[in-house]
């Protein structure tokens, strides 16, 4: 909008700690202000106070606090706020009730069924936002024309629907009145398939408003997209947060005369667009604050740097936000914040828990930064409030922060300066731990000075912050060195040069208002109105007219809404989007056609097909031309151009830059004299050679040695970053370098995983995330394994080591291996492992290996899905690969691997693979993931040298070994102190009676143990046999859980233990034994036995509840959650995957739209968790109604033996598999069976609960009590970090 002459424009970023005010004053000059967001002794509202102060300063008239401000001189107010974010983090929103379709009362509690932390035995409870749940009697399903079905109705997607049950409003009325009587006035209404049939939600909403509910969020209005779980979470967040936001808005308006009636007031949404205050809702507000910063650098740095892609680096007190801009905003449509999944357009902002307030630890030989934070109170040690040592303290010790440049607001009276002495004292305690380790550790080394320790922590913090940047760039096919680093936030300037140098970037751009760039972004942002509706059309010429009609209607809505806000049509632009995916896949992309004009073979709005293919190829590296393209949603984004034009011209330099003073800063080579400049005294053209410090009122910029800063013609700081010199690291163990390599190795495995997820085609890998990626040393020992699927953890290294021994010298450059055989380290046949040996110039043998293991949905065998319940030989379970060259001499062996995948069809009663296309596509994706790993390790070797990288592969394994030895010693010492023997044992049984026996003997002096499984049952005539690699996976998983903190996950974890497994037993069967159940069932029992021996927690559900459904037309496989075991200090979580799996479950609406089933019920199974001082988690009940004839297979455990309790805790309930025939007969299927089902049959799955812990008659201890079992740390809290807008 135009700027009325002589009036103020305010842009305000209300952060968690500080509020930044950016004002364009009459005449065009700029005034900025920073004040505390909370200061009740002086003012009620920080944004109002900021406006008052600037008006008072500019007008020269006293404006008393508490009196409504005159708005005649105010043209506009724009605000970004963390009000919604803070309410979500602190759970201070409105009291909410959830109204959901009957049978789904616990759907949002169960969610995806995956647990957030793979190795946390105390699985945190889901933090749902609703207080009560009402089930609504109604049901809509997709129409399939079964006999007896009523007339279909058409949903707004175009799908035909069957109304099985209309809404029973009378039954609902009394329940709603009861909610009102209990003080609940906000509702979230979430009904099945309401994205396409909104009428039922609308009827419920109308009734609720008539009864007096003050806020009702209908999921079909908040975000009308398929997938009820994220849509439901989004509706709940909206109902929880919108009343809080509206109360804040109303309170803000009361601070002005006329309640801002004649002032344009706009709020920043999570998608980077502004919205009128009356349309500002909770589900769109969670990233309101961070979004302003992205808009800020996109409108400044990107254009000032000639359109070069930009990485935004916003470092605050407790976390760092990174984002990317390359000419258009990058949005995601589903993301989690504070434990809540939101399905709404949001800028793609990645957060890492490393900021100025991140705490510093030295643990088992590693420098560790975060994720714990000192917070605002007590804050870092230098705040003089007894806080812990943090990154800020390390920078202060190094001389990179100057106490004199900060106000005296610290200490108990908030009237003292920063304290370098407190920082040094706190860091000295950590330095003592470091030097004690260096003196007495496994590799004695010279001690480190206090400054060297501080420098080490800063380097590790920098590497931690590089990881999400690599994920935004390298993992998506972008070169990080081709980007400019835009640095903002209070703490970022101290680290920008080092971050850019580590990523190979040439330029750092720091805006002159970088300390309040989010507020500047608000001033420069446009007003946005979006309209979206679901769709279910194929993208074909026959549907183009319908798509154009829908897009035109949505465009008209956007234009009308913006014109109502005062924008002339000439200032309004629109952009159309289609949410497209290949049929049969779950990965949809929201694509715009603005760079693909319409052709004769496209809709009038543009060639979305060409845009989709181009984007799909860029994102995933392949396309699927034989599959039709489907439109899931149509969307139009309308923009009213209103950003202010800044005319604040910087002064021209008239001489050399003035040095305020010279200080001493510590760098890699020691202390150096470092000039200090004041940003306000620098002018255009000034050039500053590093090292130097540039200080302004809001931030400190460190220009490191070898870098050069200049002041641009816009008054910004551009730093030319010198190339990183060759690494000075050598092969000797350096704890600092070890910590950095730990991050680098893990980053490699993580990026391999992202590439595999991106390039795979199958639901199992792309959506259920049933895969793992890892890096291995030249001996095949595991170096780094990203935490994907636990059952893969220890098994993959057995696979790599088998190939090394089996092939010997028959490994050549360009070879890629494929294996799945249990005797070669395989888990079960559908888990195909792809291994790439990596050669290096001058080396005759591979210098390392990378591998990826993925679960393929079908590789043949006697049943669809290759998970037969009654297999007795390995051949019945599918195609077998002992050692197969998938790629030879750089050529993909498609013909040979196709023949091998079809080979099971030659065996009587078996079939070859039923989905060859997906097999081949996923195998290529695994090869591509391995190639990414090779590239990244090659870069690491190029930086450090082969000898150093291989040495640190060994050091990182030794570090994991040390952590496990420390844990074993702590466990043994604890038992010894209580007069207990150093030998522990446990025994449990499979449902067929086969025992799993374990005896553990601890060697206290060595910190080692013998795990002896002698006494375990013999190999069985069935498929519960678990290959040796499975037992090792279970063991490494348990050891990692028992350590209780983040450690490198590698072969070193097994070094302190000797494992005895009897040959020919159920845990080490013969090569041809059937094993499919061993991987998914016996593995869980092995974990229960190990954890039971250590007394760490009670038994989990002990099962993955494998369900397979298939016929000639389709195939479907799922694993289903149950109850987690309770432990010393925590209740077991209900409805969650535990231990050896963590795969997601298909969303109910996707399930019903893709497969011939109706999910009638999916909820918790009350009372199935074992009673105890701490109660075991409940299992779930899942009921499937079949709509076609199909073969149902179930492969389950804990149907005979209950999950045990510990220390007086009662066992969890057994599972139960029932089939209810259409004629009413109920049949118990038992634990393992295949059965033909017919339309109208119902499968009822009751999964087991977890065991209880402690005598149920003992009261649970109050919060904060010491753990009952002191050998292991108490864990289980999900720490949420408030995003700091400003920090030291």
Swiss-Prot record:
Bias kind Pro residues: ranges: 1259-1270
Please state the Enzyme Commission number of this protein.
Answer: 3.5.2.9
InterPro entries given in the database record: ACX-like_C, Hydant_A_N, Hydantoinase_A, Hydantoinase_B, Oxoprolinase-like
Catalysed reactions, as listed in the record:
5-oxo-L-proline + ATP + 2 H2O = L-glutamate + ADP + phosphate + H(+)
Q: Name one GO cellular component term.
A: cytosol
GO molecular function (one): identical protein binding
Q: In which tissues is it expressed?
A: Expressed in testis, kidney and liver.
Domain of life (superkingdom): Eukaryota
What GO biological process terms are annotated to this protein in UniProt?
glutathione metabolic process
Question: Which intervals of the chain are annotated as region Disordered?
Answer: 1248-1270
PTM Phosphoserine: at which residues?
Answer: 1265
**Mostly located where?**
cytoplasm
* Similarity comment: Belongs to the oxoprolinase family.
Kindly state the subunit structure of this protein.
Homodimer.
Matching entries from PANTHER family are given as: 5-OXOPROLINASE (PTHR11365:SF2), 5-OXOPROLINASE RELATED (PTHR11365)
Question: What name does UniProt use for this protein?
Answer: 5-oxoprolinase
UniProt gene name: Oplah
């Amino acid at each position: 909008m135009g700027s009325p002459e002589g009036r103020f424009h305010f842009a305000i970023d209300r952060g968690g700690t500080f509020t930044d005010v950016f004002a364009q004053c009459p005449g065009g000059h700029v005034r900025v202000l920073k004040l505390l967001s909370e200061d009740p002794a002086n003012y009620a509202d920080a944004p109002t106070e900021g406006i008052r102060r600037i008006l008072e300063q500019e007008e020269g008239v006293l404006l008393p606090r508490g009196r409504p401000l005159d708005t005649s001189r105010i043209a506009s107010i724009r605000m970004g706020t963390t009000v919604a974010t803070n309410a979500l983090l602190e759970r201070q929103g409105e009291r909410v009730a959830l109204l959901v379709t009957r049978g789904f009362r616990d759907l949002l509690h169960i969610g995806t069924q995956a647990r957030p932390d793979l190795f946390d035995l105390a699985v945190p409870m889901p933090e749902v936002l609703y207080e009560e749940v009402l089930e609504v009697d109604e049901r809509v399903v997709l129409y399939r024309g079964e006999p007896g079905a009523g007339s279909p109705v058409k949903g707004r997607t175009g799908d035909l629907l069957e109304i099985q049950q209309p809404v029973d409003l009378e039954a609902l009325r009394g329940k709603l009145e009861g909610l009102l009587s209990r003080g609940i006035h906000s509702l979230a209404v979430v009904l099945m398939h309401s994205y396409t049939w909104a009428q039922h939600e609308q009827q419920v909403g109308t009734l609720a408003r008539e009864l007096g509910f003050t806020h009702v969020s209908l999921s079909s209005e908040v975000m009308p997209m398929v997938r009820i779980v994220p849509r439901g979470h989004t509706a709940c967040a909206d109902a929880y947060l919108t009343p809080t936001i509206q109360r804040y808005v109303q309170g803000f308006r009361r601070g002005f005369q006329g309640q801002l009636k004649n002032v344009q007031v706009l709020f920043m949404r999570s998608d980077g667009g502004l919205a009128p205050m009356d349309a500002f809702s909770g589900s769109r507000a969670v990233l309101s604050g961070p979004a302003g910063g992205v808009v800020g650098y996109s409108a400044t740095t990107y254009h000032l740097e000639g359109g070069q892609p930009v990485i935004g680096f916003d470092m605050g007190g407790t976390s760092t936000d990174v984002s990317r801009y390359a000419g258009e905003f990058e949005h995601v449509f589903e993301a989690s914040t504070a434990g809540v999944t939101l399905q709404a357009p949001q800028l793609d902002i990645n957060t890492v828990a490393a900021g100025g307030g991140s705490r510093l630890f030295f643990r088992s030989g590693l420098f560790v930064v975060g994720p714990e934070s000192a917070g605002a109170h007590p804050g870092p040690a230098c705040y003089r409030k007894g806080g812990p040592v943090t990154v800020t303290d390390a920078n202060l010790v190094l001389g990179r922060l100057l106490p004199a440049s900060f106000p005296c607001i610290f200490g108990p009276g908030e009237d003292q300066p920063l304290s370098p002495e407190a920082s040094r004292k706190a860091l000295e305690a950590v330095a003592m731990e470091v030097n004690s380790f260096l003196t007495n550790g496994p590799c004695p080394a010279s001690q480190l000075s206090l400054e060297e320790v501080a420098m080490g922590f800063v380097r590790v913090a920098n590497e931690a912050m590089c990881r999400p940047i690599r994920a935004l760039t390298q993992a998506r096919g972008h070169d990080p060195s081709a980007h400019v680093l835009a640095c903002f936030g209070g703490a970022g300037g101290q680290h920008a040069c080092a971050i850019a140098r580590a990523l190979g970037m040439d330029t750092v751009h720091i805006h002159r208002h970088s300390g309040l760039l989010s507020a500047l972004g608000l001033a420069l942002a446009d007003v946005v109105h979006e309209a979206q509706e679901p769709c279910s059309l194929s993208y074909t010429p026959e549907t183009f007219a319908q798509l154009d009609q829908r897009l035109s209607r949505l465009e008209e809505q956007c234009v009308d809404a913006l014109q109502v806000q005062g924008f002339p049509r000439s200032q309004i632009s629109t952009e159309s989007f289609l949410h497209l995916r290949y049929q049969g896949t779950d990965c949809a992309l929201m694509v715009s056609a603005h760079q693909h004009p319409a052709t004769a073979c496209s809709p009038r709005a543009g060639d979305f097909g060409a845009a989709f293919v181009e984007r799909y190829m860029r994102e995933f590296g392949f396309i699927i031309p034989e599959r039709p393209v489907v439109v899931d949603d149509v969307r139009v984004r309308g923009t009213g151009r209103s950003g202010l034009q800044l005319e604040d011209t910087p002064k021209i330099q008239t001489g050399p830059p003035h040095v305020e003073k010279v200080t001493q800063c510590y760098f890699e080579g020691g202390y150096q004299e470092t000039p200090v400049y004041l940003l306000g005294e620098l002018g255009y053209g000034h050039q500053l050679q590093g090292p130097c410090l540039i200080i302004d009122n809001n931030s400190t910029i460190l220009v490191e040695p070898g870098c050069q800063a200049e002041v641009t013609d816009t008054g910004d700081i551009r730093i030319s970053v010198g190339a990183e010199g060759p690494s000075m690291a050598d092969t000797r163990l350096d704890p600092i370098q070890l910590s950095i390599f730990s991050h680098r190795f893990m980053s490699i495995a993580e990026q391999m995983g992202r590439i595999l997820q991106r390039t795979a085609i199958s639901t199992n890998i792309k959506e259920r995330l049933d895969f793992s990626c890892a890096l291995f040393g030249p001996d095949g020992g595991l170096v780094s394994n990203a935490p994907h699927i636990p059952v893969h953890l220890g098994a993959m290294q057995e696979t790599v080591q088998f190939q090394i021994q089996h092939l010997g010298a028959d490994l050549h450059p360009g070879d890629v291996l494929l294996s799945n055989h249990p005797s070669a380290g395989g888990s079960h046949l559908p888990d195909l492992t792809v291994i790439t040996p990596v050669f290096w110039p001058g080396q005759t043998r591979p210098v390392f290996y990378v591998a990826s293991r993925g679960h393929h949905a079908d590789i043949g065998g006697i049943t669809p899905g290759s998970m037969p319940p009654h297999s007795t030989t390995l051949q019945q379970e599918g195609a077998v690969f002992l050692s197969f060259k998938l790629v030879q001499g750089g050529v993909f062996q498609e013909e040979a691997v196709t023949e091998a995948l079809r080979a099971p069809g030659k065996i009587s009663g078996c079939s070859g693979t039923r989905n060859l296309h997906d097999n081949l596509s996923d195998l290529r994706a695994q090869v591509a993931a391995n190639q990414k790993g090779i590239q990244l390790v090659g870069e690491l070797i190029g930086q450090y040298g082969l000898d150093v990288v291989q040495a640190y592969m060994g050091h990182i394994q030794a570090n994991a070994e040390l952590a496990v030895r420390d844990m074993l010693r702590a466990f043994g010492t604890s038992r010894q102190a209580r007069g207990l023997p150093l030998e522990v044992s446990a025994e449990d049984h499979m449902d067929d009676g086969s025992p799993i026996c374990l005896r553990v003997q601890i060697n206290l002096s060595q910190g080692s143990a013998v795990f002896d499984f002698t006494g375990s049952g013999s190999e069985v005539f069935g498929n519960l046999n678990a290959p040796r690699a499975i037992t090792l996976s279970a063991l490494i998983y348990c050891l990692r859980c028992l350590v209780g903190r983040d450690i490198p996950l590698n072969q070193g974890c097994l070094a302190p233990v000797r494992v005895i497994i009897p040959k020919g037993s159920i845990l080490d069967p013969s090569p041809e034994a059937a094993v499919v159940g061993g991987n998914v069932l016996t593995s869980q029992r092995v974990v229960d036995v190990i954890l039971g021996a250590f007394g760490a927690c009670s038994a989990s559900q002990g099962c993955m509840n494998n369900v397979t459904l298939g016929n000639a037309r389709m195939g479907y496989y799922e694993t289903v959650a149950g109850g987690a075991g309770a432990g010393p200090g925590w209740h077991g979580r209900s409805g969650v995957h535990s231990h050896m799996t963590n795969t997601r479950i298909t969303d109910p609406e996707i399930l019903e739209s893709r497969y011939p089933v109706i999910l009638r019920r999916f909820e918790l199974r009350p009372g199935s968790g074992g009673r105890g001082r701490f109660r075991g988690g409940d299992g779930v009940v899942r009921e499937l109604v079949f709509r076609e004839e199909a073969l149902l297979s179930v492969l389950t455990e804990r149907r005979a033996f209950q999950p045990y309790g510990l220390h007086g805790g009662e066992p969890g309930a057994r599972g139960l598999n029932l089939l209810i025939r259409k004629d009413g007969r109920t049949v118990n299927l038992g634990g393992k069976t295949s059965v033909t089902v017919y339309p109208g049959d119902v499968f009822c799955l009751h999964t087991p609960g977890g065991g209880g812990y402690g005598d149920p008659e003992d009261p649970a201890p109050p919060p904060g009590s010491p753990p009952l079992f002191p050998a292991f740390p108490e864990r289980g809290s999900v720490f949420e970090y408030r995003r700091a807008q400003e920090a030291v």
